[in-house]
Amino acid sequence: MDTDSGDLSEGELSPGPEQFSSKSFAVQAQKKILSKMATKTMANMLIDDTSSEIFDELFKVTKEYVKNKKEAHKVLKDLVKVAVKVGILYRNKQFSLEELEIVENFRKKLNQTCMTAVSFFEVEYTFDKNVLSGLLHECKTLLHELVQRHLTPKSHSRIDRVFNHFADVEFLTALYSLEGNYRPYLKRICEGVNKLLDERVL
């Protein structure tokens, strides 16, 4: 899934025992199928509607901020790919007990990050770029740790690209500016995040 051609690259999952594992093969087969689909199709299949709407708003604000549609598309495509891959690993019970503890820690940190992001939007003059950036970087670290033995260096690079973009303090400052052009995007993003928080998805 790390290749645009759709071929299942060797090492997409970290090498395991020499013997054949039908479960591992099934995971790789799913990855191969998903790699041939468009990003939008993957999102529709494996990501709920509210998350898809949030991703769409993130794409719009990223495109406007970087002034480059291709670069914005790359960031969001990487975001969706990472989400899908982690979802596949989780669904197929690929995580060890120790890794499941990391999953729980990641969920808690992501929940804290989302609640903080929404609070900074809803309560004027509370926004702290360093706090939000720090939380996002903590999420990135936990995600790297979670998929360390499962995904390739290319996937880890995708994780870095996604989190480094959204945790960039200049981007966050522009996004949360009361006088800026990004306020409508932030409003819709926070509405979606609030919905996921209410539904206990996050």
From Swiss-Prot:
GO biological process per UniProt: lipid transport; regulation of apoptotic process
Protein name in the entry: Tumor necrosis factor alpha-induced protein 8-like protein 3
Keyword Cytoplasm included in the entry's annotation: yes
Main location: cytoplasm
Originating species: Xenopus laevis
Cysteines joined through disulfide linkages: none
UniProt gene name: tnfaip8l3
Protein family: Belongs to the TNFAIP8 family.
Functional summary from the UniProt entry: May act as a lipid transfer protein.
Keywords on record: Cell membrane, Cytoplasm, Lipid transport, Membrane, Transport
Annotated Gene Ontology cellular component terms: cytoplasm; plasma membrane
InterPro entries: TNFAIP8-like, TNFAIP8_sf
Signal peptide location: none
Domain of life: Eukaryota
Region: Disordered, residue numbers: 1-24
Subcellular location: Cytoplasm; Cell membrane
Amino acid composition bias (Acidic residues), ranges on this chain: 1-10
